[in-house]
Amino acid sequence: KSKLKGQKQILLVGLFVFVTLMTIGYAAFNTNITLHVKGNIKTKPVDIGGVDVTPVTEGDGLYEDEYEEGRYVYRGSNPNNYIMFNNELWRIISKEADGTYKIIRNDVLSNRAFDERNHRSTDNNSYCTDPQYGCGVYAAVSGTFLSPSGSQSGTVTEDSSIKIYLNDDYYVNNINSTAKDQMTSHSFNIGAVENLNQSGAEEDSIEKNIAGEKMYTWTGNVGLANVSDILRASTNPLCTSATTSFNGYKECNSNYLLDKGSASLLNYWTINASSYESGGNSHYAWYGFANSSHASVSNYGAYYSSRAPRPVVFLKSDTTLNGSGTPDDPFTIV
């Protein structure tokens, strides 16, 4: 009996050791497999006109848009988003969810008013309460044009002077026939972006800015950048809203859309009207601004001719590209 008892003890100890070793071995094996798999996960490239571009999560490059599903945006100080269009350098702002490409001219055009004095009368445009100072709405809309808070409202039955210039003059006379064939008419979000004074849960955000922009659309050939295009292009985590940028200095830097290059100053109109909760500023429009100490969005009277148009168009979804998107090897349309 004693001998049998000893054999049982040896058997139990052996079984315990075996089970322990198997458990440790499995855990080690499983850990190795898990680490191996994680270490080989790769971000799926995005098709940019037939060129595979791998999205990034930091630094300059192509990002998945965190605000709109299916959309990709270029961000940072100088991402590789240069494209030759109309025999000029432009930049790709985004690949839209519908597959089209939103592009912006690398250089601004000559300064001009967003909306010339008395271009739109109050009789036909009741939103435009100060026609002698112009009006901040890009194009005519049906029904009533409202600011996000509803503090400003009225009809806008006529287009801004800058919209007429870009589509009836610039598009006709300055975009060549090849480029026209590469473009597509597209909707632009022309709603107002509101400057908010609240804090906490009621404070401004890029989500609110986008929602304001999307309240009204215009479909056509040539527009301007959205306020949110400029904000989303920044990799500075402090760039959280139009209000933050307006009240600050460089919260929205690290941003190719606010790169003044060798110039002393960059001033260009966006496509969005500016509004305040208090109302009474129908003649204001947003613009992008950069100098030696600032990189931000701000607003200004639409009748001033000290800001420039910076044209934005959309390329067709079946656009095919060559190149790497660098200044020396920009994307080219084939």
Task: List PLM regions with ranges.
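N-terminal secretory signal peptides that target proteins for export/translocation
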Residues: 1-2
